[in-house]
């Protein structure tokens, strides 16, 4: 019989840099799971994506065992990396801080496709373009 999920914990952790310190430790400690076991496994799985923030969904079962699913990095993080900026605009409709090309948007959409609720790559690109515009980025051909 399948184990019963007791709790779902969602976190965003830098790839390969999970430590028992906050925010990871307290979130997992409340769920009652082995923090060191999680951090070692997470760091091993995400070592190749250094520098990215990786969303992770941890399923905690009744017997305090766990498993986790890593997602693709947030679109905003990928856009900032593609544009080479530290942060988006504070006033995106008046102040544009960077420019991304449609080719970069397509590359990001292809990366994000497994996690997006989009039927095809064009729909995924429109979602990424919307995120870019809301961050004060200009999308060019």
Swiss-Prot record:
Instruction: Give the signal peptide, or none.
Output: none
Q: One Gene Ontology cellular component annotation?
A: cytosolic large ribosomal subunit
Task of the protein? Forms part of the ribosomal stalk which helps the ribosome interact with GTP-bound translation factors.
* Alphabetized Gene3D superfamilies for the sequence: Ribosomal protein L11, C-terminal domain, Ribosomal protein L11/L12, N-terminal domain
Kindly list the GO molecular function terms attached to this UniProt entry: large ribosomal subunit rRNA binding; structural constituent of ribosome
Instruction: Give the organism's phylogenetic lineage.
Output: Bacteria, Bacillati, Bacillota, Bacilli, Lactobacillales
Biological process (GO) annotations held by this record are: translation
What InterPro entries does the annotation carry?
A: Ribosomal_uL11, Ribosomal_uL11_bac-typ, Ribosomal_uL11_C, Ribosomal_uL11_C_sf, Ribosomal_uL11_CS, Ribosomal_uL11_N, Ribosomal_uL11_N_sf
Keywords on record: Methylation, Ribonucleoprotein, Ribosomal protein, RNA-binding, rRNA-binding
- Put simply, this protein is called Large ribosomal subunit protein uL11
